[in-house]
């Protein structure tokens, strides 16, 4: 996938900026089961993102999950309950890249569409952070509407099969548009 909002929602050269401004961290651990991150332009939320990514990371983390709302809607009526993910590959900006991969164990519950996913910016806004903190990890980015029926089942599989993988919920703090993911992660 190609970046769609580089230079608009975050700066060109974002990884270089983060590498020099985001300090190496020790002693602060990722506190699960998930971390909530905003999806807004860096001009509005960079200090919140800096705090959200202020934790020590394990370079051996193999999988990261980013769960986000689908704002644009679905392609056709029979997919109104779908959860979407981009095709496996990579998302790359001017000086960063992340590997996109949906684990096979949940692939059957998801519709794949680069077109739909490229209209959402929730992953791209935090991708430079992910490239700094989890340089070797595969990222599974899932988009859903509040009506998506597979959200609960997908979360159950993620929690069971990937207990040590960081989970980020991209949420607008004012509208709570990712509430379905938060609800599914409640014990």
What are these regions (language model features)?
Residues 1-187:
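Active-site histidine-anchored catalytic micro-motif
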């Amino acid at each position: 996938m190609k970046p769609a909002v580089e230079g608009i929602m975050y700066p060109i050269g974002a990884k270089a900026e983060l590498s020099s401004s985001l300090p190496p961290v020790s002693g602060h651990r990722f506190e699960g089961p998930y971390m909530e991150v905003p999806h807004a332009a860096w001009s509005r939320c960079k200090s919140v993102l800096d705090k959200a990514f202020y934790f020590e990371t394990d370079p051996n983390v193999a999988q990261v999950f980013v769960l986000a709302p689908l704002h644009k809607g679905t392609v056709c009526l029979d997919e109104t309950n779908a959860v979407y993910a981009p095709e496996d590959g990579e998302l790359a900006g001017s000086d960063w890249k992340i590997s996109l991969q949906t684990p096979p164990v949940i692939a059957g519950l998801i519709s794949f569409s680069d077109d739909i996913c490229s209209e959402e910016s929730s992953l791209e806004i935090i991708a430079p952070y992910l490239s700094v903190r989890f340089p070797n990890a595969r990222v599974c980015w899932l988009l859903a509407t509040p009506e998506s029926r597979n959200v609960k089942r997908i979360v159950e599989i993620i929690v069971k099969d990937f207990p040590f993988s960081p989970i980020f919920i991209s949420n607008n703090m004012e509208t709570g548009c990712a509430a379905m993911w938060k609800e599914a992660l409640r014990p």
